[in-house]
Amino acid sequence: RAPRGERLERIWRSPNYRDGAFRNRHATPQLTSGKGWWATMYDFLFERKERNRPDHALPAVKTDLKALDPKENLLVWFGHSSYLIQADGLRILVDPVFETASPLPFFNRPFEGTDLYKPEDMPGIDLLVITHDHWDHLDYGTVTKLRDRTGRVVCPLGVGEYFEYWGFDPQRITELDWGEQAALGGGFTVYCRPARHFSGRTFRANRTLWASFVVETPSQRIFLGGDGGYDTHFADVAREFPNLDVAVLEDGQYSEDWRYIHMLPADLKRAVEDLGARRVFPVHNSKYALARHPWDEPLNNAAALAAENPEAGIVLPRIGEPVRLDRSDTLPGRWWTAPEN
């Protein structure tokens, strides 16, 4: 439901909310095809797509997440933009979607082999972070099943309306505007920073905010990029938070038809260079087909970038494979290639 009451009054006071909607820092047309919304959507739905879904089951690792030592700093990716981070004893779950990423059960079906994890597989979550309200990042079925095992929700301004409506304790919901922060105690702080995107679960857009986040722990600085196109906010984050340990960046579901709201391959390279993080995890791929590009193109582009610049620290794990943040693990090669017969 739409924000209301005190939450809506706070939205009205936001410097990022103007003329009835949240706005990006710079002009950001959602579509750049020149063909209009309906024509662009028609092309997306009905134009022939080359290999936008794999023809084989993707290899994945089923890890017993509840058995992981919470003191071990690690990241486990669940495909698309869902992942678990453990940092200095804090368990952080980001944008969990363990069901169909769509209001329609037959649309946005996960690729074969990628639907390995369910809400019941998750350990107790200290911090649930939602970057925006799109269906592939905020899933009712998933978060309500996690409700009783979640300590605190952190989300952009306005998104808390969903959680309150879905039965979460308002005292455990922290909504942040760009430039705001929340101290969690014990040396943990979450900072809300811009992203270049949009929001909405219906035809009315931008009534809630979208964001990136920086999570600071006693030993880690972690950038959660969320969704969005390239802009100056990556360099701004790097200046404010030098020596990032980890950056999780969108890599996939892009198109020249919407180049300002999802990063193109060349934009990923620029964002990696701007942030200068020690390790980079490209996500937003390998589970759903939300664009016309070949399903493995984002992985191949990231692998090429890693080969071109080994110092970039690009990590491409399999779904469900724990990656230790305190050391350079040896990971499998191009796991996404089709198995030989």
Describe the role of every protein-language-model region.
Residues S14, F106-V154, T174, P242-V248:
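Active-site metal-binding motif and surrounding structural segment of the metallo-beta-lactamase
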Residues R1-R109, D115-D121, P156-G226, D245-D251, N301-G320, L325-S328, ...:
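Metallo-beta-lactamase
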Residues E6-G20, M122, L127, R152-E161, ...:
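Cap/insert and terminal regions of metallo-dependent hydrolase folds
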Residues D139-D148, L290-N300, D326-R327:
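Metal-dependent catalytic neighborhoods of phosphoester/phosphodiester hydrolases
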Residues S82-Q86, A183-N243, R259-D267:
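Catalytic core of the metallo-beta-lactamase
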Residues I85, D95, H132, D139, ...:
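Divalent metal-coordination and catalytic microenvironments
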Residues F98-D115, G200-R204, S255-I261, A289:
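Acidic/histidine-rich helix-loop elements
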